[in-house]
């Protein structure tokens, strides 16, 4: 496809080039940068809407602040595509989220302009404050700048950082990227006022800027600006939450007006002596009408046609695990009034939106607040409800103490629905669900399941609904199922019991979770070598089906465990049982296949599992090595 015409952007290799440009050229550069991002993401897919919303902010921040000496920290990081183009990575921008390409998030190892990596929310203020503390103690670092969205700033960690920043009183810049509030009326008047300001203006303090914005507006517009300020701060304009915390508050300002942004940032940089919060109002998907008109503002997109906005998604071969979860939850909720759903700002991503649309009073979206989601679910369980708490595996890590203290310790029957278990593809290591098997199985009272296919997901959800003897967790992967027929309703499984898929007598492959198909393929390869193979589906990591494991050990010469989780997960639990019962001293060789002890960069899931050594060929090779050359020779 034709690339956009970008004569001004072509002059930018690094942010220092922006600092030599006029304001008019910077505005033109932003327009060209937006076109470049749209063009690039149309070829790669990715987080388009959030990136389009911060184009002007990206240009203005890099033009005003001395990055990389000044430390720019993007919260979440999924809006960083314009930032990457401006910081020496334009030549690789069309490798976003691909194997050996650019990460879709900020990443310290990728560029000195990414001083702090991100992909989970609400960390930026803490990190930027850390840089400010390092500067005060003599380290060679400049100002700390955090760019955080209105969703991310709602999380508890962000408020902890704001509270600490206000208490320390260090020079710090927090830019609130507010893309949910429309304040169109005051934009023009504020722009005219702020354009008259400069870093050399006679204003004595930043408070003059903050207070002067509203005072220079006509009465109806001033009231609108004050309402916007009240909504974002939670207090009356005369006593904002941020000001109570020790911040100077400036805003709201138009996050797409280059003159206004430059004037505000330059004045703030020149005059700040303590923490400053700049409230910039932006539009998610700005400048690309298909994104602006979309319900999710093209938050995450596949490759698409720039002219039409039509996404190029391949037709699914089977329903996704997420959609099966959503429909099954609705079906069960219709039969049981005690079933409720809980999500932490991901109703669509988790599939819980299916229940939310049908029974909105039975779904609770708590925002980006996993800790609260877990304990809130615990409270509902204690109150007699059956909460299904649906959180991605990598995000559930954020609520681990609550799982331990508020759920497991009290043996409360919270049902944890853990989507995105295993490797997830283009989002890379930050979103991989690698650790939940180990960290959940370590807890007393916890039951841990993983489904081999979408039909098993339905059965395990029914099992979770019926389980009232403590918390229970069900992990399942991102993407399509295997295409098996779905039952009309799930069967309640016996807790701690697996199943044998096929019987053999030489090698046993014991799979936990969605790698069962690879286990079957490995069995086929081994059978072609003359080996008789048993394939079993563990179903449960906790409690283990020790009867099944003992039987496999007794009847086979090799046992191979397979899982989509980290070391010390399911395989570790099996080894612990075998060691405790003296079975590692016997005739059966044991090998555990799991994710390696390292983080795996983005690629397709198939490429990532190949990198991890978890293909069918890897499973077969592990079995052959466990059997030994002499055994194989005897069967040749």
From Swiss-Prot:
The keyword Magnesium applies. SMART domains: Transket_pyr. Its EC number is 2.2.1.7. InterPro entries: Dxylulose-5-P_synthase (IPR005477), THDP-binding (IPR029061), Transketo_C/PFOR_II (IPR009014), Transketolase-like_Pyr-bd (IPR005475), Transketolase_BS (IPR020826), Transketolase_C (IPR033248), Transketolase_CS (IPR049557). Keywords: Isoprene biosynthesis, Magnesium, Metal-binding, Thiamine biosynthesis, Thiamine pyrophosphate, Transferase. CDD domains: TPP_DXS, TPP_PYR_DXS_TK_like. Its cofactor is Mg(2+); thiamine diphosphate. Thiamine diphosphate binds at residues 78, 119-121, 151-152, 179, 288, 370. It holds the Pfam family Transketolase_C. GO terms for biological process: 1-deoxy-D-xylulose 5-phosphate biosynthetic process; glyceraldehyde-3-phosphate metabolic process; terpenoid biosynthetic process; thiamine biosynthetic process. Pathway: Metabolic intermediate biosynthesis; 1-deoxy-D-xylulose 5-phosphate biosynthesis; 1-deoxy-D-xylulose 5-phosphate from D-glyceraldehyde 3-phosphate and pyruvate: step 1/1. Binds 1 Mg(2+) ion per subunit. Binds 1 thiamine pyrophosphate per subunit. It catalyses: D-glyceraldehyde 3-phosphate + pyruvate + H(+) = 1-deoxy-D-xylulose 5-phosphate + CO2. It is an enzyme of class 2 (transferase). The keyword Magnesium applies. One of its GO terms (molecular function) is thiamine pyrophosphate binding. Catalyzes the acyloin condensation reaction between C atoms 2 and 3 of pyruvate and glyceraldehyde 3-phosphate to yield 1-deoxy-D-xylulose-5-phosphate (DXP). Homodimer. Belongs to the transketolase family. DXPS subfamily. This is 1-deoxy-D-xylulose-5-phosphate synthase 2.
